[in-house]
Amino acid sequence: MGNNVVVLGTQWGDEGKGKIVDLLTERAKYVVRYQGGHNAGHTLVINGEKTVLHLIPSGILRENVTSIIGNGVVLSPSALMKEMKELEDRGIPVRERLLLSEACPLILDYHVALDNAREKARGAKAIGTTGRGIGPAYEDKVARRGLRVGDLFDKETFAEKLKEVMEYHNFQLVNYYKVEAVDYQKVLDDTMAVADILTSMVVDVSDLLDQARQRGDFVMFEGAQGTLLDIDHGTYPYVTSSNTTAGGVATGSGLGPRYVDYVLGILKAYSTRVGAGPFPTELFDETGEFLCKQGNEYGATTGRRRRTGWLDTVAVRRAVQLNSLSGFCLTKLDVLDGLKEVKLCVAYRMPDGREVTTTPLAADDWKGVEPIYETMPGWSESTFGVKDRSGLPQAALNYIKRIEELTGVPIDIISTGPDRTETMILRDPFDA
């Protein structure tokens, strides 16, 4: 039996993690975010009602679940307050269900200003960040000048630290990027206005998780973004600024690494990517447009159109290696309904003619990579909302089986629609 279950994306994000976390939290006592910030966009559809969460864990809608934001998350006070208000306006008692690590780095206005100034300065070489200050906040953390939630307990010292760090960043903004300085007093006033709310939710997360482990409580760890955007293992520099792989659970929450019992990789039935960076199977034809339209591939956070393409099992195998995956949840299978044929990328042809079955490491090494496809028959029958494996067309079952063969990982859950009920659980991670 797995008490500590990790749910993470195996591609470039947007795989459908939020729905699956929400579904599986029916049995969980805690749901923990361990990396990223409000650059994530987790969409839940429950009884036809749509909820988009960016920072708060997806378990917040469950009455008997405690949601935790771990130390690996960079926390924007303004984004958190906005999200809390939206949920509280719908009658959800967020403050009774949400806890924070005091070690969460804060994202403040100057981080956002830096993020946007840098992207503008990069011009055609822009990374495609969400412009929410995520990267600069992580930079401050590593440089040991970042302000954290715990600093809000001493307001006088916080004001002094803020003044010092803002002098440093405003110098860059004005003299290097040639943009306006960020107003110190406004940042201080805005942060102080919510300081007591934030500190009232602080808890020792590592100790709480260890106590939960000793009691045998079920805990779900909710990943954001996707494996191929990992700061160390992704398509650098076109990556996010945190560790999106399973290793980030231990460092981003304080759970001992030996206590991770099951890692569920969320795998979209095709590939998508937002922003710049390598994408060997990207489609620029009517099939790519079909996938975008049928899959409603627009970012929950930015509204940007996602790039679309065939499923890349070479890249997914890298995710299997990096995360020691226990099983997959295959999402958006229904988007492929109606295609005469479906393709799986099984290898790459490098510019020198070599065929390889592993991904390059740096973004520059992906240049000129051509996908080698295996083509399979598609299916005309609808898989939307199918809740039993026997109800799937044979061609869809063949597609599923081939993914399992190419990756060496079983598909334990199949999602056939956005609602939590439109799901087949073949093996429950908490029972594995």
Swiss-Prot record:
GTP binds at residues 13-19, 41-43, 306, 332-334, 415-417. GO terms for cellular component: cytoplasm. Pathway: Purine metabolism; AMP biosynthesis via de novo pathway; AMP from IMP: step 1/2. PROSITE patterns: ADENYLOSUCCIN_SYN_1, ADENYLOSUCCIN_SYN_2. It is an enzyme of class 6 (ligase). Keywords: Cytoplasm, GTP-binding, Ligase, Magnesium, Metal-binding, Nucleotide-binding, Purine biosynthesis. IMP binds at D14, E15, G16, K17, N39, A40, G41, H42, T130, R144, Q225, T240, R304. The keyword Nucleotide-binding applies. Its cofactor is Mg(2+). Homodimer. This is Adenylosuccinate synthetase. It comes from Salmonella schwarzengrund (strain CVM19633).
